[in-house]
């Protein structure tokens, strides 16, 4: 099965790939050429650091190309799931213990970033939410203990 990814997530990875290819790669090539011009490569720390950075960048480029070529891109705006929670849904939850609300979007594993409210489809939170609807209650076993949440809203925002 191909890993799912939102259209927004694909754009972000493509932007990173383009930046690496068009900006970072040429910078490293220039840094290597400049370090080479300094002479003896055996004891040239600048040269070795630039080569190491080149290796890292080329590895990241290959990784991004592979991820993008295998991803199943899902346009969240075109989903018609109503109030049912599926991949791509943006869900507002109310903690039944504290009445605090939080908002998460269920995204692919490669684009997850909890600080931005993006939870991976494979995470315990997302697994508990999939298939639920507005008004449903879910229980999540968190490191801090068992938490109960009510699904307040389900939206499909691109």
Curated annotation (Swiss-Prot):
Q: Which residues form a coiled coil?
A: 45-72
SUPFAM superfamilies documented for this protein: FKBP-like, GreA transcript cleavage protein, N-terminal domain
- Write out the GO MF terms: DNA binding; RNA polymerase binding
> Where does the UniProt annotation place the signal sequence?
none
Sorted UniProt keywords: Coiled coil, DNA-binding, Transcription, Transcription regulation
Pfam families attached to this UniProt entry? GreA_GreB, GreA_GreB_N
Q: Which GO terms describe its biological process?
A: DNA-templated transcription elongation; regulation of DNA-templated transcription elongation
Q: Which NCBIfam families match?
A: greA, PRK00226.1-2, PRK00226.1-4, PRK00226.1-5
UniProt xrefs under HAMAP family: GreA_GreB
State what this protein does.
Necessary for efficient RNA polymerase transcription elongation past template-encoded arresting sites. The arresting sites in DNA have the property of trapping a certain fraction of elongating RNA polymerases that pass through, resulting in locked ternary complexes. Cleavage of the nascent transcript by cleavage factors such as GreA or GreB allows the resumption of elongation from the new 3'terminus. GreA releases sequences of 2 to 3 nucleotides.
Give the family from UniProt: Belongs to the GreA/GreB family.
**What's the protein here called?**
Transcription elongation factor GreA
* Organism of origin: Xylella fastidiosa (strain M12)
| Gene name of the encoded protein | greA
């Amino acid at each position: 099965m191909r890993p799912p990814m939102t259209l927004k997530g694909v754009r972000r990875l493509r932007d990173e790939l383009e930046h690496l290819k068009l900006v970072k790669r040429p910078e490293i090539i220039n840094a290597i050429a400049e370090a080479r011009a300094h002479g003896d490569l055996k004891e040239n720390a600048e040269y070795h650091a630039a080569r190491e950075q080149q290796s890292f960048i080329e590895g990241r480029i290959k990784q991004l190309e592979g991820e993008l070529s295998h991803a199943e891109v899902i346009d969240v705006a075109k989903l018609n799931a109503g109030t049912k929670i599926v991949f791509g849904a943006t869900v507002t939850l109310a903690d039944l213990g504290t009445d605090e609300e939080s908002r998460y979007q269920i995204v692919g594993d490669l684009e997850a970033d909890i600080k931005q409210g993006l939870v991976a489809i494979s995470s315990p939170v997302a697994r508990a939410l999939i298939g639920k609807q507005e008004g449903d209650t879910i229980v999540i076993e968190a490191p801090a203990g068992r938490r109960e949440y009510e699904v307040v809203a389900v939206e499909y925002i691109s």
